[in-house]
Amino acid sequence: MEYSKINSIGELKDSGWESKSIKDELRDNLILSRKNNVNLFSQIHGYDETVIPDLERAILSKHDINFLGLRGQAKTKIARSLVSLLDEFIPVIKGSVLNDDPFNPISHYGKELVREEGDNTPITWLHRSERFTEKLATPDVTVPDLIGDVDPIKAANLKLSFSDFKVINYGLIPRSNRCIFVINEIPDLQPRIQVSLFNILQENDVQIRGFNFRMPLDIHFVFTANPEDYTNRGNIV
């Protein structure tokens, strides 16, 4: 497919491209790599009979993943290697901070643009190298950092009410829609922050300071944890 020639939703429909979730992407590409005898984890040594088979089963089952191990056991390296299982390029609505799927936008910006422009809605292509977000969990990480908050400066500049969805400044997790999102050292994340992730993991409910709306985020979550850390310094809720 010549991505550079497809610049609108109408052209995307004509190309025959089909939308799929990130977990389906990972699953389909893992199956394809196995059929072609391609080892995507060739740079990871010593885990061929332990970690890698479990990881592959988790991907095939479309599960989020938690790597538990001591320092230096390649937890983060394995997480980063999952990028190779993503499609090389995916289309997104141009200008969307949430990487909106042209056929199924979730942001209010994306929905309004598709409603106004229809098949003329402009799209751009996102490379798989840009679909990986990594956050180190530290005690000072807040809910607005991860999920988002109301931006009073934007509201004042645009003369908008605080009830307008346009005043929301989305955090790292919504901005990682259709991406792999890694939280390293999850025990260091405050328990109340971990609890705030439950709604996203289970129900896709995003709650931002007075806003309560369902946002079906399409994210593959990966967590890493050190058993020494979560017994001495923190815990996993």
PLM ranges: what are they?
Residues E2-I236:
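Conserved ASCE/P-loop NTPase catalytic core
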